[in-house]
């Protein structure tokens, strides 16, 4: 199994914390978010991990090369003018036609989430936190068990 972690974003909502480091390197409970994600992936048998960097790329690359030399770094030099879809596009040559996990690098999650995503027969899955509505978060609408829409613009009534 492969995984793509999108880590190119500016992290502007976390400033001044992200003035010096990319958002994924911010520690939560003493552990960098990116470290928790990579450790969880490795513990669950994910064999190839691709991290797309952008903002403060040199800092993230130095950290990954030191701690996780097996992780592949894909650079998005256009991170300031593009979005996550472009970062994902940059990994196409590595994951095209294969199953892979797609993750945003700024999401802190329970350790059992990856295990749950790898179980079962469904080819496409999405992990959602249904505990509340947060204006800035990505949200989904469902039609039965099918995803109907994914957007930050979904209203509380649609959520």
For each predicted feature, which ranges?
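Short beta-strand/turn micro-motifs composed of small residues
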Residues: 7, 53, 104, 128-129
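Short catalytic helix/loop segments, enriched in acidic residues and glycine
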Residues: 20-35
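Short beta-strand-to-loop acidic/aromatic patch adjacent to the donor-nucleotide binding site
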Residues: 98-108
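Conserved core of the sugar-phosphate nucleotidyltransferase
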Residues: 110-159
């Amino acid at each position: 199994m492969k995984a793509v972690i999108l880590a190119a974003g500016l992290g502007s909502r976390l400033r001044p914390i992200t003035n010096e480091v990319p958002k994924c390197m911010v520690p939560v409970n003493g552990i960098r978010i990116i470290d928790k994600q990579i450790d969880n992936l490795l513990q669950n048998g994910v064999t190839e991990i691709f991290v797309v960097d952008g903002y403060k790329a040199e800092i993230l690359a130095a950290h990954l090369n030191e701690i996780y030399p097996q992780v592949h770094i894909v650079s998005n030099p256009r991170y300031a003018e593009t979005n996550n879809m472009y970062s994902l596009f940059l990994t196409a040559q590595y994951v095209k036609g294969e199953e892979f996990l797609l993750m945003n690098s700024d999401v802190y999650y329970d350790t059992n989430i990856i295990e749950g995503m790898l179980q079962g027969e469904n080819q496409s899955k999405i992990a959602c936190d249904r505990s509340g509505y947060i204006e800035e978060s990505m949200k989904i609408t469902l039609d039965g068990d099918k995803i109907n829409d994914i957007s930050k613009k979904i209203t509380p009534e649609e959520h």
